[in-house]
Amino acid sequence: MKITAVLFDLDGTIIDTNQLIIKSFVYTVEKHLGYKIGAEEVIPYFGEPLPLTLQRFSKDKWEIMLKTYRDYNEKYHDRYTKIREDVKEVLARLKEEGIKTAVVTSKRRELAKRGLKLFELDKYFDVLVGLEDTEKHKPEPDPVLKALELLKSPREEALMVGDSPYDILSARSAGVRSVAVKWSVLPFELLKKEKPDYFIEDMWQLLKIIKGCDEDEHEQ
């Protein structure tokens, strides 16, 4: 089936916010709970909505921790955020080929926009679906379905690219083929367990997948 739309997760997929997220959690937990945590205690929850992760640390204090986390995260956002290799070049190619694009993230819209604008990526995306845009979030299908609705694209002609099991599960439950990135900070076996339709080792391989899907359609 020809691919006419590609949906992308944001953090860890097209921009690298791993250090920002880890530092934000370390600071927040130490401030409110009085002990230090390591990256290994945070990384397994990458990809899920922030309130849920904070509730894993404290059912009582998660709301005040949420404010602290967001304040720290916004303050140091630009310092600890980097763009993933070849992202801009591949997005430009997708644009040239007339393929619609969307960001589908569990992050708040304004902070997601900030990350895109920081690297001048916003011009490559037709749609942004953030935390506020759906009641249910990944791994539920709602964010993916919302993006497809806004793009006016059929699920059969879409791909969802992400770095976590939540991206794969959200895509599958929405009836969309999934692409897992091998540069995820999460263990490869964790992604493999969810059986994504494709794996890519770099962004350029995404174009090969799209081309392969187009060729399959022509052979039918």
UniProtKB/Swiss-Prot annotation:
CDD domains from the UniProt entry: HAD_PPase
Q: Return the InterPro entries for the record.
A: HAD-like_hydrolase_sf, HAD-like_sf, HAD-SF_hydro_IA, HAD_2, HAD_sf, PGP-like_dom2, Pyrophosphatase_Ppax
An example GO biological process term is: DNA repair
Q: Which family does it belong to?
A: Belongs to the HAD-like hydrolase superfamily. PpaX family.
Q: Which Pfam families match?
A: HAD_2
Q: Can you name one GO molecular function term for this protein?
A: magnesium ion binding
UniProt keyword Magnesium present? yes
Q: What is its EC number?
A: 3.6.1.1
Cite the entry's keywords alphabetically.
Hydrolase, Magnesium
Please name the source species. Caldanaerobacter subterraneus subsp. tengcongensis (strain DSM 15242 / JCM 11007 / NBRC 100824 / MB4)
Cofactor(s) listed in the protein's UniProt record:
Mg(2+)
Q: What is this protein called?
A: Putative pyrophosphatase PpaX
Task: Please list which residues make up the signal peptide.
Answer: none
